[in-house]
From Swiss-Prot:
Location, primary (coarse class): membrane
Official protein name in the record: NADH-quinone oxidoreductase subunit D
Its membrane topology: Peripheral membrane protein
Originating organism: Campylobacter concisus (strain 13826)
Alphabetical keyword list: Cell inner membrane, Cell membrane, Membrane, NAD, Quinone, Translocase, Transport, Ubiquinone
Keyword NAD: yes
GO cellular component entries: plasma membrane
Recorded superkingdom: Bacteria
Source organism phylogeny: Bacteria, Pseudomonadati, Campylobacterota, Epsilonproteobacteria, Campylobacterales
EC number of this enzyme: 7.1.1.-
Gene Ontology molecular function, alphabetical: NAD binding; NADH:ubiquinone reductase (non-electrogenic) activity; quinone binding
Assembly and binders: NDH-1 is composed of 14 different subunits. Subunits NuoB, C, D, E, F, and G constitute the peripheral sector of the complex.
Described function: NDH-1 shuttles electrons from NADH, via FMN and iron-sulfur (Fe-S) centers, to quinones in the respiratory chain. The immediate electron acceptor for the enzyme in this species is believed to be ubiquinone. Couples the redox reaction to proton translocation (for every two electrons transferred, four hydrogen ions are translocated across the cytoplasmic membrane), and thus conserves the redox energy in a proton gradient.
Compartments where located: Cell inner membrane
Gene name per UniProt: nuoD
Amino acid sequence: MSQAPNRLKPFFENLEFEQNDGKMILNFGPQHPSAHGQLKLVLELDGEKVVRAMPEVGFMHRGVEKMAENMTYQEFIPVTDRVDYIASSANNYAFCAAVEKLCAIEVPRRAQIIRVMLLELNRISSHLLFLATHALDVGAMSVFLYAFREREYVLDLIEKYCGARLTHSSIRIGGVPLDLPDGWCEELLKFCEKFPSDITLYEDLLSANRIWQARLIDVGVVSKELALSSGCSGVMLRASGIARDIRKEEPYLIYDELEFDVPYATKGDCYARYLLYMKEMRECVKILKQCVSKYQTSSPAIIADAPEYVSASKEQIMSQNYSLMQHFVLITQGLKPPKGEIYFASESPKGELGIYINSDGSASPYRLKIRTPSFWHCAIYEDMLVGQYVADVAAIIGSTNIILGEVDR
């Protein structure tokens, strides 16, 4: 028998709650400032504690995967920017790398180095936004301002390369669209020299702060077993004691040539996740410094020599008839990978970002699936919020670092 909505026994579409004496139903979001977009949580409270949590998603659903089936592979690249719009280069790369794997395209070394630079700058930018918003959720306003100050330097570097600050479209199938501008590496090195002291400033303000520790330590604990069974990845997995990083486990680009550590913790609480984000930013700086030295000794090619799938350089298109015709065909008809299916996983700032492509040999994917880390980290709220105080819900959500563009797609 259908239930009529009333004030005593709330009714929620698609959700069923047994209203027991002394329990209260609380809607958290989707307009709440700590909801990280359009997240809605229906919480059942017993006093101050959460006894049941139900995430309700879909408010940002745009049908991205279905859009891919009606676009050419090149046309879909800007759409990937809008999945995790805080780390758009990571999405660009994962999609392009999946197509390259399907087509057996070999990317030039310099293009690989530039890609790593963009990915690690993107990682720093994403981590700084996490730190700023997480601190603001808990009440540390000054850290929010400091983190955004440094994030501006990162966005300026990315903007000088590709012209965009948020949705980059900075990676192409077969390589990258541009070489680094003059003086860009010098500016990057200046940032790398300064940024570790900025991280120290954040740590001085937060790590030993009694209020910060009281709000995060032993709050939102995710055990190793729960992290594995729930499909967690990235910092969410490493904070629970599993040091898995795809850049180390299944290296891509030039990551197997780079020296960097994979920080991990064992406690699995909000504080452990915060510490890992701080340590990861230091590792990003180490990677960027190594990339600059490797870039300076690399050959100038930035796009693959694969005429069947990739356009020639602009100079060749403007001077050679064959290159012009091949470019015209690729733009008007799109590249056509061989029939088959492929899955490619990369380590995005938030965890494992995977792209599955099923190709029927046409210029559009027969099926495309995006495996986003935020979707799985959002689903775990049903377990990790139970038993927590309602005042800690915002801090727990912030520590998982989800983006609703990834959750809903």
